[in-house]
């Protein structure tokens, strides 16, 4: 017996890909050879619910194949629908599901209930993403390493606790050179004036979006240890310089996206204030601190949840109403404030470590500040079916993200160019993303070949086999 269903061909599944709530999907199965089944059924289920079986009547022949077909109405509530096929034959039950790589397209026959089902993403009809982002070319800037805009090349900020690098020096840092601890306190002196200075160059490159790594006040060079969400790091400039950057960039058709680090702050911050360097009363200093509920202490003050065990990055308690008001919903909340100051969107750091309710509230408030602002998430896998911390993520159902960083494309591209996969698998990987992502999200993907979190592409391809 030969069985075929190809989720990428409209003959077998129509319409292709993700669909809106309440829409209808036609599914077909082709069967040929000995042992024509006495019954063919579609088995489908909404995410987290039980299986539903629906008979698939024979409708016509195509060559030697008998075609079975059924129409299924998708749920009114956004979510994922999974399906496979079961056939009753004279030799027993036969099943047909997604392939073992779970990439969609042509599936596989088996004699036990398949572990891999096909996916249909069902999203809200009002899901819209900014048009300006869909056709843009983005350029990522790690501010300290980009350009020093001061004519004399001096460092801003007057800090005395840093290691100053020469601009042409190799950014190589051995922890043992500095007491055995990596403090991320070596700086090259890049600043926002430097970004402004390079805007004509970026425009000539065809850039229409600049994604800035974190720029708020923090101890480290990378600034993922936020010290103060309200203040541009003095080594980079100030609020007026940021406004000038956004204004001049817009004049050149370039928009600025900020890195939003809302899963954790720095231990050296106005909110935690472990070292007493801020004039606030931090959560580490007193249980009466206005920020005490922002963090998760197991044994105050020294034992607390932190990002991946890094005690310099105490984890935020997103259930704290006061924290969410400050970051998200107050009139001058952080996500609104910087949009009003000229930013055109946010890239959310480690978004899979933010609970869904937090991301939904963030989207609601960002879109209030600017309905055309973009919200991009850091997700490393297929973002349509991602599960994290026991929660199925709902990034693309219409209430959370506009899109994500396209790490799956990067991996597929590197594997293909390196000769690790053939062109058929390369195509299958990319088509799987197109099949699973709603069109508004798919056409807003931040397609990358490198980022600050992975090896630079020139380094990565150094081990590519010669062709």
Residue ranges and their predicted role:
Residues 1-135, 139, 369:
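Glycan-association/targeting regions that enable binding to alpha-glucans and other polysaccharides
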Residues 24-27, 69, 121-127, 195-198, ...:
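Short alpha-helical segments and helix-capping/turn motifs at coil-helix boundaries
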Residues 31-33, 46, 60, 74-76, ...:
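Short, flexible loop/turn elements at secondary-structure junctions
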Residues 137-139, 210-212, 256-258, 346, ...:
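Hydrophobic faces of well-ordered beta-strands that scaffold small-molecule active sites
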Residues 142-208, 215-341, 362, 368, ...:
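Substrate-binding/active-site clefts of carbohydrate-active enzymes
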Residues 150-153, 387-388, 416-418, 458-461:
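Short conserved micro-motifs at the rims of enzyme active sites and ligand-binding pockets
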Residues 246-255, 264, 269-280, 334, ...:
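Active-site-proximal helices and loops of the catalytic beta/alpha 8
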Residues 431-467:
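Active-site-proximal substrate-binding groove within the catalytic cores of carbohydrate-active enzymes
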């Amino acid at each position: 017996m030969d069985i075929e269903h190809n989720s990428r061909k409209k003959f077998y599944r129509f319409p292709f890909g993700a669909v809106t709530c309440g829409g209808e999907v036609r599914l077909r199965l082709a069967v040929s050879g000995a042992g024509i089944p006495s019954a063919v059924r579609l088995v489908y289920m909404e995410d987290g619910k039980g299986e539903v079986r629906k008979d698939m009547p024979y409708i016509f022949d195509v060559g030697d194949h008998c075609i079975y077909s059924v129409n299924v109405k998708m749920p009114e509530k956004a979510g994922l629908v999974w399906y496979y096929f079961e056939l009753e034959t004279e030799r027993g039950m036969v099943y047909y599901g997604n392939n073992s790589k779970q990439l969609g397209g042509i599936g596989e026959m088996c004699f036990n209930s398949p572990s891999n089902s096909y996916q249909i993403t069902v999203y809200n009809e009002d899901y819209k993403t900014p048009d300006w982002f869909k056709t843009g070319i983005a350029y990522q800037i790690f501010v300290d390493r980009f350009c020093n805009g001061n004519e004399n090349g001096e460092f801003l900020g007057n800090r005395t606790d840093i290691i100053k690098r020469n601009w042409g020096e190799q950014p190589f840092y051995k922890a043992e050179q500095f007491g055995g601890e990596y403090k991320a306190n070596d700086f090259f002196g890049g600043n926002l004036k430097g970004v402004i200075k390079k805007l004509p160059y970026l425009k000539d490159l065809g850039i229409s979006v600049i994604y800035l790594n974190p720029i708020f006040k923090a101890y480290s060079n990378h600034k993922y240890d936020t010290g103060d969400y309200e203040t541009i790091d003095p080594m980079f400039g100030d609020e007026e310089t940021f406004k000038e950057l956004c204004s001049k960039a817009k004049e050149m058709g370039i928009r600025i996206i900020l890195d939003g680090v809302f899963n954790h702050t720095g231990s050296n911050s106005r909110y935690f204030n472990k070292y007493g360097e801020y004039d606030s009363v931090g959560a580490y200093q007193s249980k009466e601190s206005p920020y005490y509920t922002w963090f998760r202490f197991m044994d105050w003050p020294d034992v607390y949840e932190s990002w991946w065990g890094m005690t310099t990055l105490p984890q935020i308690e997103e259930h704290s109403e006061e924290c969410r008001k400050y970051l998200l919903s107050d009139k001058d909340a952080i996500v609104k404030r910087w949009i009003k100051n000229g930013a055109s969107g946010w890239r959310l750091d480690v978004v899979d470590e933010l609970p869904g309710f937090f991301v939904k509230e963030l989207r609601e408030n960002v879109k209030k500040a600017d309905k055309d602002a973009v919200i991009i998430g850091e997700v490393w896998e297929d973002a349509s079916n991602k599960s994290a911390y026991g929660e199925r993520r709902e990034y693309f159902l219409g209430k959370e993200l506009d899109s994500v960083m396209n790490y799956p494309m990067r991996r597929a591209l590197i594997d293909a160019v390196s000769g690790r996969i053939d062109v058929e698998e390369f195509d299958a990987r990319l088509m799987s993303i197109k099949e699973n992502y709603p069109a508004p999200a798919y056409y807003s993907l931040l397609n990358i070949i490198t980022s600050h979190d992975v090896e630079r592409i020139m380094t990565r391809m150094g081990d590519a086999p010669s062709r």
